[in-house]
Amino acid sequence: MDLQNPAAAWRRRDALRILAACMADWWLPRNLFAQKSSVPRKRDRRVIVVTFGGGVRYEDTLARDGWVNIPHLASDIVPQGLVYPSARHEGLTGHFNSTGALVTGSRQNVDAYGSEAPVTPTIFELFRKEHSLPPEEAWLIATNKSFGLMGGSKLRAFGDPYSANVVLPKQLLISTIKAAVSTNSGPGVEDRKALAERMMLALDEGYEGFGWRVFESDRVLSADLKASLAKSLLDYFNDPASPTSGDELTFFMAKEIMNRFAPSLLVVNFWDIDIAHYGAYSLYLEAIRRTDRLVHELWQHVQASPKYRDRTTLLVVPEMGRDSDVAGNGFANHRSGDESCRRVWLVAVGAGVPKGAGTERPIRTLDVAPTVAQLLGFKMAECEGRPLAELT
């Protein structure tokens, strides 16, 4: 035990006890020795869904040898919440269709590069329509630039009037800096050449290149709001001390949206992990650790905000896995459809979540959307998934 910090030692011991069950044949029965957090009224409830976008293998994260890559989840978040180690992704293992299944509760089969919207209603549309909510109540902040149409389906009774506000921070920054460096020097862009070079270095860290087409929904941000968000992003980017990976930009924008609007429904897509396609295992693990840190910092931001503290449920889930070394192409890909591509996990923490608990009950990523519906008090009867009883 750490005699200088006994509380930290006990937290580590608790985390090891809980996570060790992921390697055993048993798990804590639901609610056994678990104390649920207080549950706010539905109208006061807030839900944040965060994806380990790009896909991560179970063995590199929640398996015992993977804990070193998710130290904050393992030591800081899991002991406060509930973990499902036996989650499964069903359906296609591309990014758009995988995350599409998360936000609709139904398997999707549309263009993998984001030129088509989901074919079934999203949580954003159903939430806003049933409660007659303004667009400021539902947001999607995504590192993946192909997610421009993820905020809503094209169904006649839903679609753009009820879809989420979608912000792609990397793309917003690209367009902002391109506009800035094409004008005369001014505040924030004194050295246009240096700014452009820094943009190229920072924004080319991810797997997708500048040539990828970005598809935009007809539900667009107002010019004033877009300009205001772009100014904040540019100010952040201009600070030499600011980290500038795609996920760092997404994290900054998520906090900005939370501070300005305090939306009831927020989905955050981190995606630096997909750098694994380059075949560098060290970069893949570095991105996992970055995502783990950003999830923890986001949860700390929730706890520091009076509008979110004690009324927010955070759900953290990989959008899918990645190939195994034996049956697939290894960590670098996610197209084999083998079990390593499909086995994932889910961690929940916050309002209404049992503390320090877990269940070996198999669940599906399709269950995330109807669980969000139950938490926020709207109907989602037509999807394939089912609400997670432990959380609702």
Regions found by a protein language model. Name each.
Residues 26-80:
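Active-site-proximal N-terminal segment of extracellular/periplasmic enzymes that hydrolyze or transfer
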